[in-house]
C-alpha cells in the first residue's frame, strides 16, 4: 500500500452551475471528491487528504492533510460557487501544503478537478509541471465540463511535464448519463498506482457516498450526535417490541391456563355429579329395606305393649287380692321390709370388706383406689356400716325387754 499525502483542488467557479452532469457540475464534483477521499483513507490508515478551492474570493485551503474522513467530508458543505478558477495559484498553494506535511515519508500528490476553461498558456503550465516533478509531487487531473479546443492540449502538456514513471494521470469525462464518480471508480486516480483491491474500492465507495456503509446511513464521523440518537432510538424501539412480544406470550399462556382450569372444574363437577347419582340410585334401592325395618319395629312395640299390659293386669290382680285379704297384704309388707333390711345389711357387709372393694375398684377403668377422694368415700361408707351395727345392737335389747 502506498503511503501518500494528497491535496484535492475543487473547481467552484461559475461554470459549476451548469446541469450537464447530474444533478449539477458542482454536486457531481463533490460526490467524486468524497469518493476519492474515502479511497485514499481506506487504502492506508496513515494516508492523509486535504481539500482546497480554486475560485471564489481566491484560493483557499479548507482542510490541511488529515486522516479524519469526517472532517474532510464536512468541509464540502456550504461552499460558495462564483468567480473564475485559478489553476496555477491552486497548484502552487497545494504544493506548499504538502511540503509542510507531518509525515515526511508520505509521497506527495495533487488531484485537480477542472471544469472551467484554462486561461493559462501551455508554457506556463509546463513550467509549473517541471517544478512539481522537481519536488517529487505527482499530479492527477480530472477534465470535465467545458471543452474548448485548447483545454485538453494544455492539460496534456501539464501532465507530460510533471509525469515521472507514470505516476501522474489525466481523465477526460464527457457529459452523459453516467455520474462523474462512477466513471472515476475504474480509473488509476481512484485505484492508485498499485491498481487497488476490491475491498479497498468497495469500502472507499461506501465511505465516500455519504453513508452507504454506515449504520442508519449516517457517518458517525460527520455527525456523531445524530448517529448516537438514531442508535438509541433503534434500541428503544427494539426493547419496546420485545416487551410487546413478551406481554403477548404471557397473555396467551394465561388464556391457556384459564382453559385448563375451566376444563378441570368441569371434570370435578362431573365427578361430584356421579356420586350424587349413585346416591340417588342407592336411595331408590333403600325403601324396601326401610319398610322391613319399620315392620320389625312395629312388631317389637306391639309385643312390649302386650307385656306392659300383662304386668299391669297382674298388678291389678295383686291389688285386689291385697284388698280382699289384709292379712296377706300385711304379711307381704313385712316380708318386703325384711328383704330390704337383709339386702341393706348384706351391702354393708360387702363394703366392710376393704380388700373386695379395692379389687373391684382396680378392675374399673380410670379409677385409682389410692386417690384421696376415693379413700374418703370408702371411709365414710365403712363408718356408716359401723354406725348401723351399733344401732342394731342397741335395738335388740329393747326388743328383748318388750
Swiss-Prot record:
InterPro entries: PSMD4 (IPR027040), PSMD4_RAZUL-like (IPR049590), UIM_dom (IPR003903), VWF_A (IPR002035), vWFA_dom_sf (IPR036465). Residues 241-261, 385-402 have a biased composition (Basic and acidic residues). Plays a role in maintaining the structural integrity of the 19S regulatory particle (RP), subcomplex of the 26S proteasome. Plays a major role in both the direct and indirect recognition of ubiquitinated substrates of ubiquitin/26S proteasome-mediated proteolysis (UPP). Binds and presumably selects ubiquitin-conjugates for destruction. Residues 241-292, 302-321, 363-402 are annotated as: Disordered. Component of the 19S regulatory particle (RP/PA700) base subcomplex of the 26S proteasome. The 26S proteasome is composed of a core protease (CP), known as the 20S proteasome, capped at one or both ends by the 19S regulatory particle (RP/PA700). The RP/PA700 complex is composed of at least 17 different subunits in two subcomplexes, the base and the lid, which form the portions proximal and distal to the 20S proteolytic core, respectively. Interacts with PI4KG4. One of its GO terms (molecular function) is polyubiquitin modification-dependent protein binding. CDD domains: PSMD4_RAZUL (cd22297), VWA_26S_proteasome_subunit (cd01452). This is 26S proteasome non-ATPase regulatory subunit 4 homolog. The gene is RPN10. Residues 221-240, 291-310, 323-342 form the UIM domain. Residues 5-189 form the VWFA domain. One of its GO terms (biological process) is proteasome-mediated ubiquitin-dependent protein catabolic process. GO terms for cellular component: cytosol; nucleus; proteasome regulatory particle, base subcomplex. PANTHER family: 26S PROTEASOME NON-ATPASE REGULATORY SUBUNIT 4. Belongs to the proteasome subunit S5A family.
Amino acid at each position: 500500500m502506498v503511503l501518500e499525502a494528497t491535496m484535492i483542488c475543487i473547481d467552484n467557479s461559475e461554470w459549476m452551475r451548469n446541469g450537464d452532469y447530474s444533478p449539477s457540475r458542482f454536486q457531481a464534483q463533490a460526490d467524486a471528491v468524497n469518493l476519492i477521499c474515502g479511497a485514499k483513507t481506506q487504502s492506508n490508515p496513515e494516508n492523509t487528504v486535504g481539500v482546497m478551492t480554486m475560485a471564489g474570493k481566491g484560493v483557499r485551503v479548507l482542510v490541511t492533510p488529515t486522516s479524519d474522513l469526517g472532517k474532510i467530508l464536512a468541509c464540502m458543505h456550504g461552499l460558495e460557487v462564483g468567480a473564475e478558477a485559478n489553476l496555477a495559484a491552486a497548484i502552487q498553494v497545494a504544493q506548499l501544503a504538502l511540503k509542510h506535511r507531518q509525515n515526511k515519508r508520505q509521497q506527495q500528490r495533487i488531484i485537480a478537478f477542472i471544469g472551467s476553461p484554462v486561461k493559462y498558456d501551455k508554457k506556463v503550465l509546463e513550467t509549473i509541471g517541471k517544478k512539481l516533478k522537481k519536488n517529487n509531487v505527482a499530479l492527477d487531473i480530472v477534465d470535465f465540463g467545458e471543452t474548448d479546443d485548447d483545454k485538453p492540449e494544455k492539460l496534456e502538456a501539464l501532465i507530460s511535464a510533471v509525469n515521472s514513471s507514470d505516476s501522474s494521470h489525466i481523465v477526460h469525462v464527457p457529459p452523459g448519463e453516467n455520474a462523474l464518480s462512477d466513471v472515476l471508480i475504474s480509473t488509476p486516480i481512484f485505484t492508485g498506482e498499485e491498481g487497488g483491491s476490491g475491498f479497498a474500492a468497495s469500502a472507499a465507495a461506501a465511505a465516500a457516498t455519504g453513508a452507504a456503509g454506515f449504520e442508519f446511513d449516517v457517518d458517525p464521523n460527520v455527525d456523531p450526535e445524530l448517529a448516537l440518537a438514531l442508535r438509541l432510538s433503534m434500541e428503544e424501539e427494539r426493547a419496546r417490541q420485545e416487551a410487546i412480544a413478551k406481554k403477548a406470550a404471557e397473555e396467551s399462556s394465561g388464556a391457556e391456563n384459564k382453559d385448563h382450569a375451566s376444563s378441570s372444574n368441569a371434570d370435578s363437577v362431573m365427578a361430584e355429579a356421579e356420586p350424587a347419582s349413585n346416591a340417588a340410585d342407592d336411595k331408590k334401592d333403600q325403601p324396601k329395606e326401610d319398610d322391613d325395618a319399620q315392620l320389625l319395629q312395629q312388631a317389637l312395640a306391639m309385643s312390649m305393649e302386650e307385656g306392659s299390659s300383662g304386668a299391669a293386669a297382674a298388678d291389678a290382680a295383686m291389688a285386689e287380692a291385697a284388698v280382699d285379704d289384709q292379712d296377706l297384704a300385711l304379711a307381704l309388707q313385712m316380708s318386703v321390709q325384711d328383704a330390704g333390711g337383709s339386702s341393706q345389711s348384706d351391702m354393708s357387709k360387702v363394703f366392710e370388706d376393704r380388700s373386695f372393694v379395692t379389687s373391684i375398684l382396680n378392675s374399673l377403668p380410670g379409677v385409682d383406689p389410692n386417690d384421696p377422694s376415693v379413700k374418703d368415700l370408702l371411709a365414710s361408707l365403712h363408718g356408716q356400716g359401723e354406725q348401723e351395727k351399733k344401732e342394731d345392737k342397741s335395738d335388740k335389747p329393747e326388743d328383748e325387754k318388750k
